[in-house]
Regions:
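Rossmann-like S-adenosyl-L-methionine
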Residues: 2-7, 12, 18, 223-460
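Short, conserved phosphate/pyrophosphate- and ester-handling motifs at nucleotide-, phospho-/glycolipid
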Residues: 40, 164, 287
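Short, aliphatic-rich beta-strand segments
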Residues: 201, 207-217, 275-279, 382
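Extended interfacial segments that mediate partner engagement and assembly in macromolecular machines
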Residues: 60-72, 78-186, 206, 221
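Residue-level signal for inorganic ion chemistry
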Residues: 24, 40, 83, 199, ...
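Short, acidic/hydrophobic/Gly-rich beta-strand patch recurrent on exposed beta strands
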Residues: 22-27, 146-149, 213-215, 344
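Short, solvent-exposed loop/turn elements at beta->coil junctions and helix N-caps
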Residues: 117-124, 189-190, 198-202, 437-440
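Terminal RNA-binding accessory module
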Residues: 1-72, 76, 109, 361, ...
Length: 460
């Protein structure tokens, strides 16, 4: 019998789903997904939707809390939804992430590979170096920052997001006060009226430099000189103030035109010793300290020797490969985004003549470039793969096998596609030695992982 809407069930939460919801089973065996619950919770759950083989519910009453449950220290954690695991002890969160990665490699990849304990983030809160606040109005009609409630474009005001450094929250609130005092209107999606759509902020984890970028419907910003003066007086680490223009009716945050009100238009920072310049469009890991831990694992798994050639596919701004440039003879990077390749070349140049001389970066589709390089006879000793969430296509993986590197290191933001690709490589002569989950997104369900693969059989 299907579950009925508003039906109440007493359920025990067994595990977490991929989106962080608790998973339980009805007496008839139907899976029920319940946000805001933890494994071990006994709860009264209200059914909101039955989809046949599974259903969705909400927590109506917590009967017996899980030992892994902790008090939630954010008033809007529920409606905001940005911290889907804020109610769980961090050690339990890490265990859950390890189990999720292990399940993907076992169930999707069919691989019997050691999945190590998840490495924690050095910072559990205030770890993000980037924030994109939509700008709306609070219940009194005043401009406010916040985040969209799940599956809506309704802004939940959030003056102090626990994932952002305090100074970024302070800047967002100060800007809203400036908007209110100067009659600057937030953008309204329904009417298409208003000026300010988003507040986009970056902060260098090591440099402390801050970029302020206001996403607006037009380039001319009223009281711009006064705005810059007020920001610089209150926040001395601000290095750039920008206007990004997005006049389209779209969910895409940034537009194509950016105007500088103050500073060079970017901030500077370092990642594993690699100097980087970050503008509004730069793709960059949002948790710098945990990313350095991730790259350290990747370097360890690469086992580079001084005579080696390293091929870095999906290289982005070149940070992974450049962080290992002193360990190899030659570095070749491939990335499809032109701006990222320009940044990679500039980053290499800033590291000095020796690194610049041994580094080559190409703007191309990773799979097509890999196939071309393989056909040209390139035989790198180590290949680094860091694909988007969809993973690698078969063209890329086939080219990797054709180039026959001694080792392959696969960095992934999606354990499911990583497991699939690792299984393909196993079928074509590579051995998955181990998988290291690394937590770059505490308080959320997301987890990165690094896979070490070697050519042929290895001693157990």
């Amino acid at each position: 019998m299907p579950l009925q809407k508003n039906q109440l069930l007493t359920l025990r939460i067994e595990r977490l789903s991929s989106d962080g919801s608790g998973v339980a089973h009805s007496p008839e065996g139907e899976a029920v997904f319940v946000p805001g619950t933890a494994p071990g919770d006994e709860a009264q759950v209200r059914i909101v939707k039955d989809c046949g083989r599974y259903a969705f519910g909400i927590l109506d009453k917590l009967l017996t809390p899980s030992p892994d449950r902790i008090p939630v220290d954010c008033a809007v954690a529920g409606p905001c939804g940005g911290c889907s695991l804020r109610h769980m002890d961090y050690a339990a969160e890490l265990r859950s992430k390890q189990e999720s990665v292990a399940d993907a490699f076992r169930r999707i990849g069919g691989l019997d590979v050691p999945v190590l304990d998840a490495l924690p983030s050095p910072e559990v809160d205030r770890y993000r170096n980037k924030v994109q606040f939509p700008v709306g109005r609070d219940k009194n009609g005043a401009p406010c920052i916040g985040f969209y409630a799940g599956r809506t474009h309704r802004i939940v005001p959030c003056p102090d997001c626990k994932l952002q450094p305090g100074v970024l929250n302070d800047i967002g609130n100060a800007l809203c006060s400036f908007f209110a005092s100067h009659g600057i209107q937030p953008y309204d999606e329904e009417s298409g009226k208003g000026l300010v759509r988003h507040i986009f902020l970056r902060r260098g984890a090591h440099s402390g430099q801050i970029m302020v970028c206001l996403v607006c419907t037009r380039p001319k910003f009223p009281h711009s000189e006064e705005l810059v003066t007020a920001l610089r007086e209150q926040f001395s680490d601000i290095a750039s103030v920008l206007i990004n223009v997005n006049a389209k009716k779209t969910n895409v945050i940034l537009g194509e035109e950016t105007v500088s009100l103050y500073g060079p238009g970017y901030i500077e920072d370092t990642l594993c010793g690699v100097p980087v310049r970050l503008g509004p469009l730069s793709f960059y890991q949002v948790n710098t300290l945990a990313a350095e831990r991730l790259y350290g694992i990747a370097a360890e798994y690469a086992q580079l020797e001084p005579s080696d050639v390293l091929l870095d596919l999906y290289c982005g701004m070149g940070t992974i490969g450049l962080s290992m440039a002193d360990r190899c003879r030659e570095l070749i990077g491939v990335e499809i985004v032109p701006e990222a390749i320009d940044s990679a070349k500039a980053n290499a140049a800033r590291m000095g003549d020796a690194v610049a001389a041994k580094s080559r970066f190409f703007c191309a589709d990773a799979g097509q470039a890999a196939a071309r390089l393989a056909a040209e006879g390139l035989r790198p000793d180590v290949i680094m793969l860091d694909p988007p969430r969809k993973g690698c296509d078969e063209t890329t993986l086939s080219a990797v096998v054709q180039m026959s590197p001694r080792r392959v290191v696969y960095v992934s933001c999606n354990p499911s596609t990583a497991a699939r690709d690792a299984a393909w490589l196993e079928e074509h002569g590579y051995h998955a030695e181990k998988v290291q989950p690394v937590d770059l997104f505490p308080r959320t369900r997301h987890c990165e992982c690094v896979i070490a693969l070697s050519k042929g059989e290895i001693d157990s």
